[in-house]
Amino acid sequence: MLEDARFSGIDVSPWGKFDRGLLAVYPLLFHLLDVAAVAGEVWDRVLTAGQRQLIADGMGVPLGEARCLVMFVAGLHDLGKLAQFQQRESHPWARVSLALRADTAGWQRMPHERASMHSALQLLEDAGYNTDASDSPGVRVAQILGSHHGRFLQLDLDGAAKASRVNLALGGPKWQDLRRRYFALLRHLTGAQPVPLRLSVPASVLMTGVGVIADRLASQRHLLAAEGSSPRIWRSGALGPDGQGRPAVG
């Protein structure tokens, strides 16, 4: 975990946002972290005290832990972009690390919000979330991710959402590992270590709303266009062929 948190510790070549006009590429991991951070601001500045308490009570955790969990869940919304989505645009796809581009055999096209829902389910279970039934907290968190474009999706626990089917559809071992590492890094950086034993429907709806707002705010074109062209890792020579950062030249 500490290694992944270092500048050169994790592959940041997969893209999250792309401006065709400016050819500006914004790394997916940065977008996930942006949305998590903005979700914390939405919690502090937009939600009422009653809404914050409703979410905390709906998860059975204190307010401070609830804030961390809301940030974590909001940040996970685009985890499903670590999949065939990456090939949608040729320019940013060409920047994806060689190792990842070589590990795509068998992956299938899937809306990224559904891919987020499906891929997160197993990761949530591995993290200790109950995913046994449709009303379990792990399943509801996964559905929050699937609904970040405004429509709640059905999650078929015994069908399309089974880990064996998901792993076949969303890329090879390197993509699976990177999804796991992004998940773990987000959880670590947001402090969302507590595992809620429940997640009520009203809390789920409010958390979905926080995530939608945070995503919209963090995805404003004028911000992404500027930031997508400026980080050190996107300067000439700042990314190695493995997609990991190295100091900029010059």
What role is predicted for each listed range?
Residues 1-250:
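Accessory nucleic-acid engagement/destabilization modules that flank
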